[in-house]
């Protein structure tokens, strides 16, 4: 029908929905504020976060999400200030963390109580400060007189007399619920506080999410199938990109072997052994052996020398009396010898 506004049902207060709202708030705070155009969005987002936390808190403590009547009468008379102290039973339960239970993660539980009751809730007395050294330093100073008292919760409210009494009564009832320790594993408020802390830290995971049916079917099949026990697989060392030394024979011994088998004039040495055929007979080239090719020239001492030459170099040179035959020597006949030609 034209003119009627469509009303949508509000989402249920679940941890996942609260986590989505917190993520939206972080994203909203990271964006620049363009002339205040996001003011209403931030206000609506804060109101929704407060509503979800309030419903979750009521569900945790009261066991239902039914909202208590928050209607207050009209103010009558001047504004007054009322306060009341509720002492924490630390002597009866010395190991219970009442301060963390009342304040909650980053003070969210106390802030939620203040928003719901309209009162200011503060933890005072011995052990109310996290830093014990600072607490001892401030003890006895002005405005720190409460450190000489026992641990207690101070509830204050400012309003008209008739309204302040109602607010204070509601706040006292809610705080008294927090001063009753629950058994380990049955503290629903502690579970909620841990969940809120995980949401704030970004580490929350919903434990109610079930695995797909396919995963269960595969797991059942794997359990029904026979199992074969095998030894652990050997761990191989990582392969190097470039070997430091060549795996095969280097190229220089083969070059020296060929140089030894050849005389300086190019003729094969008579005493040189022929390189046997095989994989080591040819020149082996690998792409990473080029540093070995830059070797100095082979010394002349590596070539074989005749034993007679070595002896002749040491002993005195022997004069030869026979005439060496010259290849171009002319033949002198008797007629030419007589004429002198």
Curated annotation (Swiss-Prot):
Gene Ontology CC terms, in alphabetical order: cytoplasm; cytoplasmic stress granule; cytosol; nucleus; synapse
Q: Name one GO molecular function term.
A: RNA binding
What is the official name of this protein in its record? KH domain-containing RNA-binding protein QKI
Q: What happens when the gene is disrupted?
A: Embryonic lethality between 9.5 and 10.5 days post coitum (dpc). Embryos show a lack of large vitelline vessels in the yolk sacs, kinky neural tubes, pericardial effusion, open neural tubes and incomplete embryonic turning. Conditional deletion in cardiomyocytes in the adult heart induces dilation of the ventricles and a rapid decline in cardiac function, associated with severe disruption of sarcomere organization. Conditional deletion in neural stem cells leads to hypomyelination in the central nervous system due to impaired cholesterol biosynthesis.
Q: Which organism is it from?
A: Mus musculus (Mouse)
Assembly information from the UniProt record: Homodimer; does not require RNA to homodimerize. Able to heterodimerize with BICC1.
The record comments on the domains as follows: The KH domain and the Qua2 region are involved in RNA binding.
Residue numbers carrying Omega-N-methylarginine = 227, 242, 256
Gene name in the database record: Qki
Q: What job does the chain carry out?
A: RNA reader protein, which recognizes and binds specific RNAs, thereby regulating RNA metabolic processes, such as pre-mRNA splicing, circular RNA (circRNA) formation, mRNA export, mRNA stability and/or translation. Involved in various cellular processes, such as mRNA storage into stress granules, apoptosis, lipid deposition, interferon response, glial cell fate and development. Binds to the 5'-NACUAAY-N(1,20)-UAAY-3' RNA core sequence. Acts as a mRNA modification reader that specifically recognizes and binds mRNA transcripts modified by internal N(7)-methylguanine (m7G).
Q: Which stretches of sequence are listed as region Qua1 domain?
A: 11-82
Tissues with expression: Highly expressed in myelin-forming cells. Expressed in oligodendrocytes and astrocytes in the central nervous system as well as Schwann cells in the peripheral nervous system. Also expressed in the yolk sac endoderm, adjacent to the mesodermal site of developing blood islands, where the differentiation of blood and endothelial cells first occurs (at protein level). Expressed in brain, lung, heart and testis.
What is a single Pfam family found in this protein's UniProt entry?
KH-I_KHDC4-BBP
Describe what happens upon changing residue 21 to A: Impaired homodimerization
Q: SMART domains, alphabetically?
A: KH (SM00322)
Cellular localization per UniProt: Cytoplasm; Nucleus
What PTM annotation applies here?
Methylated by PRMT1. Tyrosine phosphorylated at its C-terminus, probably by FYN. Phosphorylation leads to decreased mRNA-binding affinity, affecting transport and/or stabilization of MBP mRNA. The level of Tyr phosphorylation in the developing myelin is highest in the first postnatal week (P7). During the vigorous accumulation of MBP mRNA between P7 and P20, phosphorylation in the developing myelin drastically declines. By the end of the fourth postnatal week (P28), phosphorylation is reduced approximately 90%.
Query: GO biological process: any one?
Result: axon ensheathment
């Amino acid at each position: 029908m034209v003119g009627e506004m469509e009303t949508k049902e509000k989402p249920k207060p679940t941890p996942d929905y609260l986590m989505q709202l917190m993520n939206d708030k972080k994203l909203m705070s990271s964006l620049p504020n363009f002339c205040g155009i996001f003011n209403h969005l931030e206000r609506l987002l804060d109101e929704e976060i407060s509503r979800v936390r309030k419903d979750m808190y009521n569900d945790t403590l009261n066991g239902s999400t039914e909202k208590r009547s928050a209607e207050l009468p009209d103010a009558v008379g001047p504004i007054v200030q009322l306060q009341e102290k509720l002492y924490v039973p630390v002597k009866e339960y010395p190991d219970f963390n009442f301060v963390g239970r009342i304040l909650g993660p980053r003070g969210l539980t106390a802030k939620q109580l203040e928003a719901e009751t309209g009162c200011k809730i503060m933890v005072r007395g011995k052990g109310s400060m996290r830093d014990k050294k600072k607490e001892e330093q401030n003890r006895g100073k002005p405005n720190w007189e409460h450190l000489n008292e026992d641990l207690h919760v101070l509830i204050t409210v400012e309003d008209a007399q008739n309204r302040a009494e109602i607010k204070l009564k509601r706040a006292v009832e809610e705080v008294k619920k927090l001063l009753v320790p629950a058994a380990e594993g049955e503290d629903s408020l502690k579970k909620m506080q841990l969940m809120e802390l995980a949401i704030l830290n970004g580490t929350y995971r919903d434990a109610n999410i079930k695995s797909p049916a396919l995963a269960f079917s595969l797991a059942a099949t794997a359990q029904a199938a026979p199992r074969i026990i095998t030894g652990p697989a050997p761990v191989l060392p990582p392969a190097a990109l470039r070997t430091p030394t060549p795996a095969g024979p280097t190229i220089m011994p083969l070059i020296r072997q060929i140089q030894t088998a050849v005389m300086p004039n190019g003729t094969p040495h008579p005493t040189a052994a022929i390189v046997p055929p095989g994989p080591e007979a040819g020149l082996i080239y690998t792409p990473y052996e080029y540093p070995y090719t830059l070797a100095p020239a082979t010394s002349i001492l590596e070539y074989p020398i005749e034993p007679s030459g070595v002896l002749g170099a040491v002993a005195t040179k022997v004069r030869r009396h026979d005439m060496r035959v010259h290849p171009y020597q002319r033949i002198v006949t008797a007629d030419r010898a007589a004429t002198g030609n």
